[in-house]
UniProtKB/Swiss-Prot annotation:
Gene name tied to this protein: trxB
Enzyme class: oxidoreductase
Family: Belongs to the class-II pyridine nucleotide-disulfide oxidoreductase family.
Name of the protein in its database record: Thioredoxin reductase
Keyword Flavoprotein: yes
E.C. no: 1.8.1.9
Lineage, top ranks: Bacteria, Pseudomonadati, Pseudomonadota, Gammaproteobacteria, Enterobacterales
Protein source organism: Buchnera aphidicola subsp. Baizongia pistaciae (strain Bp)
């Protein structure tokens, strides 16, 4: 029950998330006169702000940083009078219309439609020794923390785009960069693999077919990692270093919506298909876009595209259900 004394704000459309999907949804829905309200969440700009170089954004032949791109999107959405709130939604009820959302400031909101674009968060290895050193030598962001390891030895764990981007970035700061990957081959883009292999002539050292068993350190932080390699005669070996950067993928931020929306492996299920309304969830009026629905492509541009589709789907839903003149 909501007490009558509480002030409840009502909006046609509320967008959760401030990555490429969220901001693109805001731009399109604002142009449709839906007057969207966007909650940035705690991770303003999404995980893209930690990307040092984006070389595949159409129209930008010269690379730009993730922060630059997200600032552009933020400013674009704001210029169209999107109301942007730097808070997080901590509770939702999608079973009643209008939909109810509660922020971390205990402000209540209702909405005719919601677009979920809450993105994903970095995964950790799950080691007991890892959790002790988060912020003390264990990091998930080379752009954020790489500076602290100038002329020191570090490791990057992973084999995808993020891992190779982190390794390449750190190779310009650290003395040595150990790239530890559980497989023998990398899943990153070919151009990144080529650049990384070229850097093996300098200061990137490959440890493929290896897993991290333990992160070793003391009161002053990380001192090394213990790894097990398939082709190692000793099987286990210790690498002395000062920092470990984890880049093994991301998990969608969808916990808030469990028991209300249909999911598979924590990814929100949407209609897809060829008949439109592709971003709708199992609840009409609730749409999802970006990394919360995509475990395959995981690109800024595909997130942005799905944000566009979600806005168009929401516009059609609101127009048909409520008859707004858009």
């Amino acid at each position: 029950m909501i007490e009558n004394t509480l002030k409840i704000e009502h909006h046609k459309l509320i967008i959760l998330g401030s990555g490429p999907a969220g901001y693109t949804a805001a731009i399109y829905s604002a142009r449709a006169n839906l007057e969207p309200l966007l909650f940035t969440g705690n991770n303003k700009g999404g995980q893209l702000i930690n990307t040092n170089e984006i070389e595949n954004w159409p129209g930008d032949s010269k690379s730009l940083t993730g922060l630059e791109l997200m600032e552009r999107m933020h400013n674009h959405a704001k210029s169209l009078n999107t109301k942007i709130i730097p808070n997080e939604i901590i509770r939702v009820n999608f079973f009643k219309i209008p939909f109810l959302l509660v922020s971390d400031t205990n402000q209540y909101y209702t909405s005719d439609s919601v677009i979920i674009a809450t993105g994903a968060s970095p995964k950790y290895l799950g080691l007991t020794s890892e959790s002790k050193f988060i912020g003390k030598g264990v990091s998930v962001c080379a752009v954020c923390d790489g500076f602290f390891y100038k002329n020191e030895d570090v490791a990057v764990v992973g084999g995808g785009n993020t891992a190779l981007e982190e390794a390449l970035y750190l190779s310009n700061i650290a003395r040595k960069v150990y790239l530890i990957h559980r497989r023998k081959t990398f899943s990153a883009e070919k151009i990144l693999i080529s650049r990384m292999l070229n850097k093996t002539k300098k200061n990137i050292i490959l440890r493929t077919g290896c897993i991290v068993n333990k992160i070793i350190g003391g009161v002053n932080g990380v001192r090394g990692v213990q790894i097990t390699c398939n082709d190692s005669k000793e099987n286990k070996c210790l690498i002395n270093l000062s920092g470990v950067f984890i880049a093994i993928g991301h998990a969608p931020n969808t916990k808030l919506f469990k028991n209300q929306l249909f999911m598979k492996n924590d990814y929100i299920l949407v209609k897809s298909g060829i008949h439109g309304n592709v971003t709708q969830t199992n609840i009409p009026g609730i749409f999802a876009a970006g990394d919360v629905i995509d475990h395959v492509y995981k690109q800024a541009i595909t997130s942005s595209a799905s944000g566009c589709m979600a806005a168009l789907d929401a516009e059609k839903y609101i127009d048909q259900k409520y008859g707004f003149k858009i």
